[in-house]
Design a protein with these regions (language model features):
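Secondary-structure transition motif
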Residues: 1-190
Length: 190
C-alpha cells in the first residue's frame, strides 16, 4: 500500500531524449499530457464530463503510483558476456564499464550501424528502464494556462535567461514538436 492509500501501481510513460535529460538533471518535475475523453451519448453525461467531476480517472494513475520512463534504448551485451569479456580478454576495470542509453550519447557519439543497437522507446521493457517517477499530484487545466514557474518545471533550460523569466514560447514550441503544428493554438485540456 502506498503512502497516499490504496495499492501502488507502476505504469509506463514515454519521454523524448531532451526530456529524459531534463528529468535526470532535475529540471523536469512536471509533465502535461492530452486528456483523451471517452464521451458517452447522453446530454447529461456530456455536461457531467465537461465539468471535470473528480470521477475523471487519469490513465497514468493517482498520487503515490509510479511511472517508469520509456526512452530510446539498446542492449549492447548481457552481463555474462560483459563479465567474460572484461575478465578474460581485456581486463577493463569495473569502474569503466557501464550501460549505454542513447539520450546521454546522442549529442556527441554514435555507434556504427546504430539502427542495429537502438530500439524505440515504445518497445522498452520494464527491466531496462532506469528512471521511475512517483506521482505526487494531479490537476486538469487548459494548456495555455501554464504558469511561469510551470514552464521551468516542464524542463526548460535557458542559460541566457538567468532571472528565470517565463518562456511560454519555448514551451509552446516543445508542445508542438511533440503534438504537431497548431496543437498549441487548440488550447486543449491537459
Amino acid at each position: 500500500e502506498g503512502k497516499w492509500g490504496g495499492e501502488v501501481k507502476d505504469r509506463p510513460i514515454l519521454f523524448s531524449g531532451p526530456m529524459v535529460r531534463a528529468i535526470r538533471e532535475g529540471r523536469k518535475t512536471q509533465t502535461r499530457r492530452l486528456i483523451k475523453f471517452e464521451w458517452s451519448g447522453s446530454r447529461e453525461a456530456l455536461m457531467h464530463q465537461a465539468t471535470f467531476d473528480p470521477a475523471y480517472k487519469c490513465p497514468y494513475g493517482k498520487p503515490g503510483d509510479r511511472l517508469w520512463v520509456r526512452e530510446t534504448w539498446g542492449l549492447m551485451a548481457n552481463h555474462d558476456v560483459t563479465d567474460w569479456f572484461r575478465d578474460s580478454i581485456v581486463g577493463i576495470p569495473e569502474s569503466e564499464l557501464r550501460e549505454l542509453y542513447l539520450v546521454e550519447h546522442a549529442a556527441n557519439w554514435r555507434i556504427p550501424s546504430e539502427s542495429a543497437y537502438w530500439r524505440p522507446s515504445i518497445h522498452m521493457p520494464r527491466w531496462a528502464s532506469r528512471i521511475t517517477l512517483e506521482i505526487v499530484s494531479l490537476r486538469v487545466e487548459k494548456l495555455q494556462n501554464i504558469s511561469n514557474e510551470d514552464c521551468w518545471n516542464e524542463g526548460m533550460c535557458d542559460a541566457t535567461n538567468p532571472e528565470r523569466k517565463a518562456n511560454r514560447k519555448w514551451f509552446s514550441e516543445l508542445w508542438e514538436s511533440i503534438n504537431g503544428l497548431g496543437s498549441w493554438d487548440l488550447n486543449p485540456w491537459v
